[in-house]
Swiss-Prot record:
Cofactor: pyridoxal 5'-phosphate
Protein's organism: Thermoanaerobacter sp. (strain X514)
Lineage per the UniProt record: Bacteria, Bacillati, Bacillota, Clostridia, Thermoanaerobacterales
Gene: bioF
Alphabetized GO MF terms: 8-amino-7-oxononanoate synthase activity; glycine C-acetyltransferase activity; pyridoxal phosphate binding
Name listed for the protein in its UniProt record: 8-amino-7-oxononanoate synthase
PANTHER family in alphabetical order: CLASS II AMINOTRANSFERASE/8-AMINO-7-OXONONANOATE SYNTHASE, LD36009P
Length: 395
């Protein structure tokens, strides 16, 4: 008989994970996040980082962080609505609003908490959320917390989206369409022009999670709205400071009244200590770098195009990727994990992704090249992919 006191029921659940082959241990990174990293004691080419632009170890960001610690200390000491709102926080939000070409921005502790906080503050019981079936887990959790009804539409299927919009047209006070800007497992881009047209036709709010588009799509990485020239037509944009920006945190960009409302009702914002000064200063410096030049985003896309084309020429299935996120579709879960393990033996770290993160029989090794990778890095990785792919009869 299990006892709550000694957590036997948790032990049983862990055993179930092990039997199903989905139990995992944390990978240990023993160096800064970069194109070549030390992982579990082995120096490898890193193809699994979200550090798209190589900014996580950039000297200008490190200098800004150190100077901020000297000036502001290591922590804000309070939530921003009490006494944790430093001038540096306000400066970051002004910079982000200018960069995103939006009226205002509010920062959160992560992109995950931004989604959870914004969704539940904007919609409520009596409203409806229309959500893409492949949206991120933070969107799913935010929808659950909102108390609004949730209707799922087929992934990037505009006919299905319109079908849902017709069904809910006169039944709800507020209708909100939510989509990722770039989908993290397949690397495809949301059909935002069509989504925006449908939202305008059926009087719905548009909400875009730009976590994997910020710093990647648009002029100097301004995101999906800029990529599609949709400024002023997307109501709510979520961004992250932890991927291309290279630091930590999240934010929401939009109309000033939206930000004012979130100041009063965004629960993760209201009840979490403000971002530490070092992270804020480093994020400001990252935005400065992107605003000065598009060199990093151009290098990122050059590398992504090169790597993707070479993988395809070797015979790998890269799915429907349109971005630096390039999955190598394997199919079988065990083979995908073995592929990842053998790549590591060859000096390449590329994470195997299996069910339930992706559908059954759609297991893959997901790769992300960065602006910091050299052509030599990519060629060495491709050589390993070819060798292991042939060993496992994948190509």
């Amino acid at each position: 008989m299990s006892s709550i006191h000694d957590l036997d029921f948790i032990k049983e659940k862990l055993e179930e994970l092990k039997k199903a082959g989905v139990y995992r241990k944390l990978t240990v990174l023993e160096s800064p996040s970069g194109p070549r990293s030390i992982i579990d004691g082995k120096k490898v080419i890193n193809l699994s980082s979200n550090n798209y632009l190589g900014l996580a170890n950039h000297p200008r960001l490190k200098k800004a962080a150190i100077e901020a610690i000297e000036k502001w200390g290591v922590g804000a000491g309070a939530v921003r609505t009490i006494i944790g709102n430093m001038t540096i926080h306000e400066e970051l939000e002004r910079k982000l609003a200018e960069f995103k070409r939006e009226e205002a921005v509010l920062t959160f502790q992560s992109g995950f908490t931004a989604n959870m906080g914004v969704i539940q503050a904007v919609v409520d019981k009596g409203d409806v959320i229309i959500s893409d079936e492949l949206n991120h887990a933070s969107i799913i959790d935010g929808c659950r917390l909102s108390r609004a009804d949730v209707v799922i539409y087929k992934h990037s299927d505009m006919e299905d989206l319109e079908r849902v919009l017709k069904e809910v047209k006169d039944k709800y006070r507020v209708k909100m369409i939510i989509t990722d800007g770039v989908f993290s497992m397949d690397g495809d881009i949301a059909k935002l022009p069509e989504i925006v047209k449908l939202a305008e036709k059926y009087s719905a709010i548009t909400y875009v999670d730009d976590a994997h588009a910020s710093g990647v799509l648009g002029e100097s990485g301004r995101g999906s709205a800029d990529h599609f020239n949709l400024h002023g037509r997307i109501d709510i944009q979520i961004g992250t400071l932890s991927k291309a920006i290279g630091v930590v945190g999240g934010y929401v960009a939009g109309k000033r009244e939206l930000i004012e409302w979130l100041n009063h009702r965004g629960r993760p914002f209201l009840f979490s200590t403000a971002l530490p000064p070092a992270a804020v200063a480093a994020s400001i410096e990252a935005i400065n770098i992107l605003s000065e030049s598009d060199a990093l985003t151009r290098k990122l896309w050059d590398n992504a195009k090169y790597f993707k084309e070479k993988l395809k020429s070797l015979g790998f299935d890269t799915g429907k990727s349109e971005t630096p996120i390039t999955p190598v579709i394997i199919g079988e879960e065990t083979k995908a994990l073995e592929f990842s393990r053998k790549l590591f033996e060859e000096g390449v770290f590329a994470q195997g992704i299996v069910y339930p993160t992706v559908p059954k029989n759609k297991a893959r090794v997901r790769t992300i090249v960065t602006a910091a990778h050299t052509k030599e890095d990519l060629d060495a990785a491709l050589k390993a992919f070819e060798k292991v792919g042939k060993q496992l009869n994948i190509i």
